[in-house]
Design a protein with these regions (language model features):
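Short beta->alpha connector loops at strand-helix junctions that form conserved
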Residues: 118, 123-125, 152, 172-173, ...
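Residue-level signal for inorganic ion chemistry
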Residues: 11, 56, 117, 148, ...
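N-terminal Rossmann-like NAD(P)+-binding subdomain of aldehyde/semialdehyde dehydrogenases
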Residues: 1-84
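Conserved small-residue-rich beta-alpha loop and adjacent elements
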Residues: 75-143, 189, 211
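ALDH superfamily catalytic-core signature
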Residues: 176-228
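A glycine-rich helix N-cap at a beta->alpha junction
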Residues: 144-150
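A structured beta-alpha segment of the ubiquitous adenosine-cofactor-binding alpha/beta core
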Residues: 82-84, 150-167
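Short gly/ser/thr-rich secondary-structure transition/capping motifs
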Residues: 72-80, 150-153, 216-217
Length: 228
């Protein structure tokens, strides 16, 4: 028998369900972000919900073609063999997410990981508890537990999860925590993606409209409580 529980068609179906669930629960998401970050609805829409919706629609549109086996050129040393690029999942993926964009930075990596056929656990930040609860409700209502789930908790839960063996770890957050995760991952040679915080420098030269540049820098620096 063929297992269709995690087929490309099933993943696309789940993404469409996720999109519908987000639309249905939009007011609840806004309230959670307001509670955790005091975000205005318009900012929450632009910086969180809109980006997630666009990511889902992109994968729904492109996943079938991205998942296909592709013929690629190879070395003359392998003649007369044929060479193919075959997309395969890593396996079990851990996603640890920050408090500053708690909705968007949880779901966008989830979408990519699920699209590739992985099983995913999200550990959201305990500093955004209302959004964390909404995330758990959304994910649990859409995905089978063996495909994706959310585990809430403080740093001790993150430590417990990091002590387990994973096939891939995705982390967004501080450089300090990133170093800890890199060290943990290295013990099992686990591949990782670390999106770490920085100072967001901006270079301004003499040929610019200084008033316009100043407004743009201030806007970029102070959006989302300066967490961009």
């Amino acid at each position: 028998a063929t297992d269709t529980s995690n087929s490309v068609s099933k993943r696309i179906q789940n993404f469409n369900s996720l999109l519908k669930s987000i639309k249905h629960n939009e007011s609840k998401i806004y309230k959670a972000l307001k509670h955790d970050l005091n975000k205005h609805e318009f900012e929450s829409f632009l910086s969180e919900i809109l980006l997630v919706k666009k990511e889902i629609k992109l994968f729904v549109r492109k996943l079938r073609s991205w998942s296909k086996k592709k013929r690629v050129s190879g070395s003359i040393l392998n003649f007369p063999s044929r060479n193919y690029l075959i997309p395969e999942p890593y396996g079990n993926v851990l996603i640890i997410t920050p408090w500053n964009y708690p909705f968007q930075l949880s779901l966008t990596p989830l979408i990519g990981a699920i699209a590739a056929g992985n099983a995913v656990i999200i550990k959201p930040s305990e500093l955004a508890p209302a959004t964390s609860r909404v995330l758990k409700e959304l994910v649990d209502s859409v995905f089978p537990q063996n495909m994706a789930t959310v585990i809430e908790g403080d740093a001790s839960i993150a430590k417990y999860l990091l002590d387990r063996k994973w096939d891939y770890i995705f982390f967004t957050g501080s450089t300090r925590i990133g170093k800890i995760i890199a060290e943990k991952a290295a013990k099992n040679l686990t591949p990782i993606t670390l999106e770490l915080g920085g100072e967001s420098p901006c270079i301004v030269d003499s040929g610019v409209d200084i008033d316009k540049v100043a407004k743009r820098i201030v806007s970029g620096k102070f959006v989302n409580c300066g967490q961009t």
